[in-house]
UniProtKB/Swiss-Prot annotation:
Function recorded in the entry: This is a receptor for the tachykinin neuropeptide substance K (neurokinin A). It is associated with G proteins that activate a phosphatidylinositol-calcium second messenger system. The rank order of affinity of this receptor to tachykinins is: substance K > neuromedin-K > substance P.
Subcellular compartments: Cell membrane
Gene: Tacr2
Family that this chain belongs to: Belongs to the G-protein coupled receptor 1 family.
Membrane-traversing stretches: 33-56, 70-90, 108-129, 150-170, 197-218, 252-272, 291-310
Alphabetical list of Pfam families matching this protein: 7tm_1
Protein name: Substance-K receptor
Organism of provenance: Mus musculus
GO cellular component: plasma membrane; sperm head; sperm midpiece
Domain of life: Eukaryota
Length: 384
């Protein structure tokens, strides 16, 4: 995604790939560059640390290894990669207007970080679909561990396929002594191919996934808030179970809304720019791009914060992960949250448990047919 008229940076939706023939010198005062560098450094540190911690919390604690949380791992990994590669190298490129990293890394930067962006949005969509099936259709078969891994593999393959055109047409050019990593679209008279690619990507990785997630979470919300725990069960584990489901929906809706807000200005920047390319030659456009790019990349650091604030198990996990910090002292309750698996069936009789699991959408197909209560995955949600 191009920073300005003279540069085509290595993110998705490159602004001036094949049409950047002139060079405009973009420079900024040292203090301004230092401020931007500090802002991007803070973003990368928070995003990488937060998402790495989320991955550790889930993988290191068996209770957290649920179908939904495996998708959250995939989302966290994608966000971590976006922060480490997109935010870091594209900031250097956009702020200096020179590609320092060679031709091989130019291809890599136009493939892997772009793939990670696709994986991020599709992982959120998979989480919405999984929760939709679990809550709205609790008697339908749930994804098994092998099926979940297969879905994750398909997500990565589809993301690679969508990112491959930008990688395929990547090339290194030297313009007035400055090395550029550009995406040179073939036979792109009038920028029609560029605009088409922008629109296709916008629809496939922004508009359609958001529509699907909005519809799924709307139905989930209506389903959960319509159901009420019977009076004789309106306390203890059953009520906590329903409340946990509602908190999960709130957390994931916040994740989706945050993503939508962060990325919309960035997508519009490039779509609108195809209609008025001379704007990329304006001196101020570098600052506009750096601001919009920071906003888009900042979406990678918010999810761990949301999980920590809205889910007690992730909050306990963060305390354990940062137990060396003054504010991260874990308690015995925090350890139990991540290691102890309560048995709902010990608290209530089987038929009442079965009814409650149906209402909260956590009954698997085998439980519905055999009257069995499942393990950690099928009790109080371990996810956010």
């Amino acid at each position: 995604m191009g920073a300005h008229a003279s540069v085509t940076d290595t993110n998705i939706l490159s602004g001036l790939e094949s049409n950047a023939t002139g060079v405009t010198a973009f420079s900024m005062p040292g203090w301004q560059l230092a401020l931007w560098a500090t802002a991007y450094l803070a973003l990368v540190l928070v995003a990488v640390t937060g998402n790495a911690t989320v991955i550790w919390i889930i993988l290191a604690h068996e209770r957290m290894r649920t179908v939904t949380n495996y998708f959250i791992i995939n989302l966290a990994l994608a966000d971590l990669c976006m922060a480490a590669f997109n935010a870091t190298f594209n900031f250097i490129y956009a702020s200096h207007n020179i590609w320092y990293f060679g031709s091989t890394f130019c291809y890599f930067q136009n493939l892997f970080p772009v793939t990670a962006m696709f994986v991020s949005i599709y992982s959120m969509t998979a989480i919405a679909a999984d929760r939709y099936m679990a809550i709205v259709h609790p008697f339908q078969p749930r994804l098994s561990a092998p099926s979940t891994k297969a879905v994750i593999a398909v997500i990565w393959l589809v993301a690679l396929a969508l990112a491959s055109p930008q990688c395929f047409y990547s090339t290194i050019t030297v313009d007035q002594g400055a090395t550029k990593c550009v995406v040179a679209w073939p036979n792109d008279n009038g920028g029609k191919m560029l605009l088409l690619y922008h629109l296709v990507v916008f629809v496939l990785i922004y508009f359609l996934p958001l529509v699907v997630m909005f519809a799924a979470y709307s139905v989930i919300g209506l389903t959960l808030w319509k159901r009420a725990v019977p009076r004789h069960q309106a306390h203890g584990a059953n009520l906590r179970h329903l409340q946990a489901k509602k908190k999960f929906v709130k957390a994931m809706v916040l994740v989706v809304v945050t993503f939508a807000i962060c990325w919309l200005p960035y997508h519009l920047y490039f779509i609108l720019g195809t209609f008025q390319e001379d704007i990329y030659y304006r001196k101020f456009i570098q600052q506009v791009y750096l601001a919009l790019f920071w906003l888009a990349m900042s979406s990678t650091m918010y999810n761990p914060i949301i999980y920590c604030c809205l889910n007690h198990r992730f909050r306990s996990g963060f305390r354990l992960a940062f137990r060396c910090c003054p504010w991260g002292t874990p308690t015995e309750e925090d350890r139990l949250e991540l290691t102890h698996t309560p048995s709902i069936s010990r608290r209530v009789n089987r038929c009442h448990t079965k009814e409650t699991l149906f209402m909260t959408g956590d009954m698997t197909h085998s439980e519905a047919t055999n009257g069995q209560v499942g393990g950690p995955q099928d009790g109080e949600p371990a996810g956010p």
